[in-house]
Amino acid sequence: MYNYLSGNHFDKPFLLPANVCPVVPLSFMKAGVGFEFIDIDESHAMSTEKCLTAIEAGKYSGLVFVHAYGKKYDNKEFYRAVKSLDPNLCIIDDCCLCIPELVDSLPENVDLCLYSTGYAKFIELSYGGYASFRGYEVVDY
């Protein structure tokens, strides 16, 4: 995620869910990309309603959606609504707690999808993870 953030020169902050792993905001800080926290809902996921309201203001470069506790949410409609408000807004799908999937394409409207292989994950290699992003696949050891 750090390489993606630092290599794309985002000039506005991202929205992060309030319950995100501390590694995520640290990666944003190291990359020099701003962020703001947004509340979570009763499912422990980012409040999509509050997120869409915030995005309407046009002051964000993107958002990170965390699939809390490894539960894979169906976000097609939410991501479609986000892109309809701002097609240039970057959507990072944080699946770090989910069972890793090796797929040939990203979910619709997702710009970066992350999986972790670090400590206490479904596939534990003790370190790292991998990401897929629009047009490329990257594996980082």
Spans of model-derived segments:
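Donor nucleotide-activated moiety binding/catalytic core segment of transferases
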Residues: M1
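PLP-dependent aminotransferase-like
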Residues: Y4-D86, C90-I92
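Nucleotide-sugar donor-binding loop of glycosyltransferases
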Residues: A18-V20, D39, C95, S116-T117, ...
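Active-site-proximal flexible loops/turns
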Residues: M46, D74, P100-L102, I123, ...
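Short, conserved loop/helix-junction motifs that constitute active-site signature segments
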Residues: V82-D86, L106-E108, R134
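Conserved active-site segment immediately N-terminal to the catalytic lysine
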Residues: D93-Y130
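Active-site C-terminal subdomain of aminotransferase-like
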Residues: Y136-Y141
